[in-house]
């Protein structure tokens, strides 16, 4: 239990603390721990000794700023310097030098890492905690077996099993097991030690008598263990190398518990082993056998392996410390080799001559580049960044695999309550394996998840953090009251949680109370208003789609929210705050100048048109004016998708739930052209194109404006250096960078020179390899720059980056969604005069299908749009905490109807609230002017445009690449692929009798090599399209496959003539 200093009221914890605290733990503890563990290195004669003075290490301040690291495509890191001492005992000479060990990537102020200019994040991994866990499992005959699983700190494991005949086995894999007696003897115990160290000696004595082989000594046991482990048959003689191999393979990988794992057997088996003893001892094994036999007799308890007390979080600190340990191991081996070679060749030794920085640099580079939990930061909007940093994954090295993970692992466990969100998880094969931290959850130094509760004892008031093992022993009342009601006991009986069950108990028996209703959910789920009225599946989709919302050109604050929007925007780092108190003296789009009281000024630079990882535009907008006096912490500028310091990924749109000529069938959505003309759903996207300039075998590639092979029109935007001019509007096919590549002259042979002289051929010694605007890439050029990467010496390459800004209005085919999982595709854009309009003449902006509500059970969208309508007319914003039914029944409905009624009275619009059909009003058809037959639900809903846009997905292919083996078109937009015609498509064409189209698709358009070239000529010349006259390539491939199986397949044409069958070989 951890007590907090603050009393009474509470503040929300920082949402990105899990990343910062992990890195802080690595820098303050893990780094020094690993450096101090670095061993003394001596030569074979023990005359030369090398030692690192780990406690005096220094980290140099980075030579580059965070934003410059992204701009210049380099790694944001700090150089590590450690003093080292080299002692030569023969002449008693000691040399000390400060060594450069390498660079360690630093965490940025946003809680991320910048590797080669790319923003990355380390996802926290939740794994089984090391220790021993007892369970009951069925064997292959479905007979229950009691097992004790010992999980090591490395993730390796082995099992102790007791079967129906009271035989105890040690199992390393499904196939291999051996008697526990063999293992105990191999550990160095004698028969007397074993029998004296257990509570059930008779069972072990009986087991000894029933052994197949007579094992008398430790050496015999080691040989038996070695033969079993490596499946060796025949006679094996004992040697020291066998002992070392077993120690390395078995004992080190499966017996090392670590500091965290040591606590588990101490508590479970009532042992007093010191916590710094990280390996499993023989006495631990004897106690574990005793407990296993006790469980067989009904004494002791089984463990729930999915309980959070048996799982821990591996955060940034664990990952980086593990990589540093690996790098120092490589360095140790390198020093030993260098020292051995130098002494052998009688060279002088210095500390700098022994240590190289390569192990540290390559280890971290490989880790951040290839580890599955080092991921591209999702930068679609600030919420996506925040959720990505708080993600928990059970996948990755040392974790589970998505193919073998069981339903029990994926399911919601009662211990998740207040620690892991029960709603937000991945859809599909990763369901339950990728989860998200709850709002008030935090990770302690040992990796266990804690949740906060409010102590309601009479003598003191404070907030406590309970671990998953602790909160089972307390009765905890659910979050059924707000902070303003703390201390009152208006309910004599309350609902409480005790030992993973819900009980109704007297108020005096409650130990703790939940802080507030949203503490059980993640950030994404907590931003959904009226969450309690939605089905959990739709709430999951809603939290996912908020992450996918594209920042808009003109964002707007939501009318109906939950109150967490400001905290998300603040903790994501997307808003800019003043660092000191002062007065604003200068403001423009790129800089804000603050004057302090002592006539000093501070300049705050704003981000303008920066590309995110997801190609969205990051831009900051100043929200204060010159002359404003500010205090420390006040807002200076809004960032991407924020308004007034609150998250704003969408717009408040006037929606109607009604069918309209079938155009909103099956989640299709009708929109008004007002959304286009007024840039309601217009977003900015930045695409980056790059081209390398290399030194080839034929010469250096040249960047130039003079490209003889191309038309001057496509070169019109190039400057004298061959780069595109900033501010140019470029279209598909325009050249962005003019480049000529030297090529080998094919006419240098004697016969080539003769032809050149006869025909007067001018030989082109270069070919154009320009960077051109691809299809759909038109836009405004906002930046063009040379980038000199860190590995420039390796491949002699320099890179040019061109950034193009696109302004995308909403189109047919774009995906839009609300916060309740109500998503759809834009099917038609209507003129505003044709849209249905309200009784005051306001045309509706969007028409949604009413059938999308009852079956999906996301009624929260109806509450939101009706309350939004009232707020729009009364110029109010609402921040509603979910689960307001704790105050009274139907509280949400009463609130919405009371606000609508007040709005109709204040604005003198009686149609806003009509008692006969509350929440609905009569709409007028914009085309005819008639009133619709039924009243329609109309309101202001907060809708978002998602990143799934038709511009990125639409694709057409006239001709393109073919696969080498099947000769069929490739698959996918990125490869300029074709449309797949599968079984169902063939059936559809067959059912309509479209024989010629079907034949074309299966032959001419696909893999009929000769015929497809003839088709192109026939289309150009206007001749009839020829029929295929031979077998397509896929059938030839099938024949070859069958022949490889020694099956010869011939195909014949059978015709009946004069009542005789005649076979012709095709």
Swiss-Prot record:
Main subcellular location of this protein, as a coarse class: plastid
Assigned EC number: 2.7.7.6
GO terms assigned for molecular function: DNA binding; DNA-directed RNA polymerase activity; ribonucleoside binding
GO biological process: DNA-templated transcription
Membrane-traversing stretches: none
Localization terms from the record: Plastid, Chloroplast
Family designation: Belongs to the RNA polymerase beta chain family.
The name this protein goes by in its record: DNA-directed RNA polymerase subunit beta
